[in-house]
């Protein structure tokens, strides 16, 4: 809803979790928003799961014909299994690599170009100097979002209290009192553990622009409506007070963007 209310002239792509396929895409209010975005020239993508094991392959295999007819421009994938699954079935829409399908150097970019995949997400492990050497003018750069520190089939809820078959979020705390958020995806039986503080490069905007990324990604995972609105205002509203307030409202990190060469 917050994206629906934003001016679309500055939005190039919207990527939605694949779970909207089969539920949300059939709902009128979601269809209305999709129609609005597409008429505004916004590209629409579905994001594939972090783990693409046999159960995911079976589900997507059963749904592939309907899935392939969705009003989308392509998909964002996070693993090789999803790539080969799509290629084996002749998927001919755009494929975008997420940041964990590493492209550290020109050899990596060339490999994927040979696979007819040219859109990628800049690796989170590289700093600004390394990103400049990589050349991300044909890639996306994550400028806001929580990072998965672990993706695991070892379900925390199942281990500690038994499987409830209900997806949700648990808070973990380590010996240094740092918090992590564990989201369990029961439909495909895996966990994603996120950092408490998201990456936020808004204060580095001039340096981000010097890299000329094709897209600047704002990635939402655990945010509620109010938090989402705050983040969007921080990036889309040019009023300096709004930008400053957005920075104060959220604890954040700049990730590896300012770090020295590893």
What kind of region is each of these model predictions?
Residues 1-111, 115-262:
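Active-site pocket-lining/capping segments in soluble small-molecule metabolic enzymes
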């Amino acid at each position: 809803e917050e994206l629906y209310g934003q001016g679309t002239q500055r939005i190039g792509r919207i990527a939605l979790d694949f779970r909207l396929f089969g539920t949300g895409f059939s709902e009128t209010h979601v269809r209305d928003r999709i129609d609005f975005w597409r008429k505004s020239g916004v590209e629409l993508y579905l994001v594939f799961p972090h783990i693409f094991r046999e159960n995911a392959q079976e589900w997507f295999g059963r749904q592939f014909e309907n899935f392939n007819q969705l009003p989308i421009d392509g998909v964002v994938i996070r693993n090789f299994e999803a790539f080969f699954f799509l290629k084996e079935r002749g998927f001919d829409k755009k494929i975008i690599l997420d940041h964990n399908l590493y492209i550290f150097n020109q050899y990596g970019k060339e490999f994927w170009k040979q696979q007819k995949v040219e859109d990628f997400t800049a690796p989170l492990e590289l700093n600004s100097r390394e990103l400049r050497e990589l050349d991300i003018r044909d890639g996306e750069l994550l400028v806001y979002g929580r990072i998965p520190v672990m993706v695991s089939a070892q379900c925390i809820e199942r281990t500690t209290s038994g499987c409830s078959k209900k997806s949700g979020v648990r808070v973990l705390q380590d010996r240094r009192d740092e918090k992590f958020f564990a989201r369990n995806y029961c439909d495909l039986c895996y966990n994603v553990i996120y950092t408490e503080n998201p990456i936020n490069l808004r204060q580095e905007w001039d340096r981000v622009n010097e890299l000329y990324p094709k897209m600047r990604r704002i990635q939402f995972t655990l945010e509620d409506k109010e938090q989402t609105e705050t983040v969007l205002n921080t990036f889309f509203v040019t009023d300096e007070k709004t930008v400053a307030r957005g920075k104060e409202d959220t604890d954040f990190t700049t990730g590896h963007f300012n770090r020295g060469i590893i």
